Regions:
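Residue register of alpha-helical TPR repeats
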Residues: 11, 50, 70, 90-91, ...
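Residue signature of alpha-solenoid helical repeat architecture, marking inter-repeat boundaries
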Residues: 7-8, 46, 86, 126, ...
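Amphipathic alpha-helical segments of tetratricopeptide repeats
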Residues: 33-40, 73-83, 113-124, 153-164, ...
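Hydrophobic positions within repeat-based interaction scaffolds
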Residues: 3, 7-14, 286-335
Length: 335
């Protein structure tokens, strides 16, 4: 978005929002409200859309789903009127992520596809890459592997055109990781080692910490399925050594969920509980029912495997209660 037509005060507010929206919620809300108050007086759809979008983003970061939905709805109406396609696409991407986290894949898919419609009106590919990666991940969860590969390879071709900066390397790591997982889950193991070699050779040094953990989770699955148990255990040791570092693992929750299922399969009980004990307080803080259900389902599998009947029954009861809550949340999301 360009703001050259506005006075210095408004441009200052806008810059404060852009500088602080990912690190200072209070300041971001203050300047967004200043922008909205000014825009209300001047009936400026562009500024109203901008202000409400970044307030919605703050609510998303704070995991206030209800406030996010109410605010992003206001943002979308103004952004549409102003023709600000990039923020509309970003809004639909966040809506898709929230729906996906809540376990409603069809609604998430609709949001992502709506976002891609607006991406076609943009010359910058970054938002389209993000949404196509998310579509690939969603289709992997839904076991629609052909569709997943289509989205991921489209994202790969777009990412190859970007400047070779840190963002480029992060996209490439994420895309290759998801392609590898997609192939392994289909039993297509040939060539997957080459994908991981490319990640380590071309992108590893510039990758973010969480990107690396995600890749290690994928490598663990690959080495287990290919019978390379020594290499599998090396990856497990790397991940286990980082579990207690107070890192925001919620960003790779689905990777860690699949990883925990694998730990159960290969009797890595200590490492399994290290992950669970790290994730549990974060999941409670986020208060996302679908994540709580997934965590409880892992415990149920563990208790059943080890014949811990009392713990199994208690966890099963909690799972039932959470399932009922998710049904209500799904109805509310649809309505």
């Amino acid at each position: 978005m360009e703001f050259t037509e506005y006075n210095d005060i408004v441009k200052g507010w806008v810059q404060e929002v852009l500088d602080n929206h990912q690190k200072d919620a209070e300041l971001t809300l203050k300047y967004c409200n200043d922008i909205i108050e000014y825009a209300d007086r001047t009936d400026d759809a562009k500024l109203l859309g901008f202000g409400y979008y970044y307030i919605a983003e703050v609510y998303y970061i704070l995991n206030d789903g209800d406030s996010f939905f109410a605010t992003v709805s206001k943002a979308l109406s103004y952004l549409e009127k102003a023709g600000e396609w990039e923020l509309i696409a970003r809004s639909y991407n966040i809506l898709g992520i929230i729906a996906m986290n809540r376990g409603n894949l069809p609604i998430a898919y609709d949001y992502y596809l709506n976002g891609l419609v607006y991406c076609r009106k943009l010359s910058a590919p970054e938002v389209e890459i993000i949404i196509k990666i998310n579509c690939g991940s969603l289709n992997i969860q839904g076991r629609q592997y052909g569709e997943a590969e289509k989205f991921l390879y489209e994202a790969l071709e777009l990412a190859k055109r970007l400047p070779k900066d840190k963002t480029y390397h992060s996209y490439m790591v994420c895309i290759y990781q998801n392609i590898a997982i997609c192939l392994v889950l289909q039993g297509k193991l040939e060539g997957v080692d080459g994908i991981f070699r490319k990640v380590h050779t071309d992108h590893w040094q510039e990758a973010d910490y969480l990107d690396k953990i995600g890749v290690l989770c994928a490598e663990t699955l690959y080495y287990h399925r290919s019978g390379s148990y020594e290499l599998r255990d090396e990856c497990i040791a790397h991940i286990d050594g980082d579990v207690g570092n107070n890192i925001a693992f919620m960003d790779i929750f689905d990777d860690l969920y699949t990883y925990c299922e694998l730990l159960l399969e290969c009797d890595k009980d200590k490492e399994f509980w290290n992950i669970i004990d790290t994730l549990e307080p974060m999941i409670r803080n986020f208060n996302i029912t679908n994540m709580q259900l997934k965590e409880i389902s892992l415990k149920i599998k563990y208790y059943r495997k080890h014949n811990q009947n009392a713990e199994y029954l208690q966890a099963a009861g909690l799972y039932y209660e959470l399932s009922e809550r998710r049904e209500v949340e799904t109805r509310d999301m649809i309505n």
